[in-house]
Design a protein with these regions (language model features):
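Short, Lys/Arg-enriched N-terminal segment that forms or immediately precedes the first helix
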Residues: 1-11
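Amphipathic alpha-helical dimerization/coiled-coil segments
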Residues: 87-111
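Beta-hairpin "wing" of winged helix-turn-helix
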Residues: 61-74, 80
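Basic amphipathic alpha-helical segments that dock to polyanions
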Residues: 51-61
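Short, aromatic/basic-enriched loop-to-helix "N-cap" motif that marks the start
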Residues: 48, 74-75
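N-terminal helix-turn-helix DNA-binding core of bacterial DNA-binding proteins
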Residues: 10-52
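Basic, amphipathic "hinge/linker" alpha-helix immediately C-terminal to the N-terminal HTH DNA-binding motif
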Residues: 75-92
């Protein structure tokens, strides 16, 4: 497997985890750049070119609510996980735990 193929698989796995991490972090309202920093601090480094389209898609799908904050010098769009987003985050969290357990069981079988 070439290095670029390997990196592609890692990127695909990480992209899926960004959805869950974003939904969980945005239970407290936040804006895009702040979320980028939070994701990086939590071990999910993300590119702005990945995050902003994701936020728009999740909003369009009803998993995020948003509003503009114009109180500061520069208007910022704040996002918050919607009720549907909380349900999705709960389901995804359970699924990730099940996948981690299944993966650990496979690892145990190898030994």
């Amino acid at each position: 497997m070439s290095e670029s193929e390997f990196d592609g698989h890692l990127q695909e796995l990480r992209r899926g985890t960004i959805v869950l991490a974003s939904l969980r972090l945005l239970r407290t309202p936040g804006y895009g750049y702040g979320l980028l920093e939070q994701l990086a601090s939590a071990g999910f480094p993300t590119d702005a070119n990945t995050l902003y389209p994701l936020l728009r898609r999740l909003e369009k799908q009803g998993y995020l609510d948003s509003e503009w904050n114009t109180d500061e010098a520069r208007p910022r769009k704040f996002y918050r996980t919607s009720k549907a987003g909380v349900r999705l985050a709960t389901t995804l969290t359970q699924e990730v735990a099940a996948i981690a357990a299944a993966t650990a069981a496979l690892r145990d079988e190898e030994n």
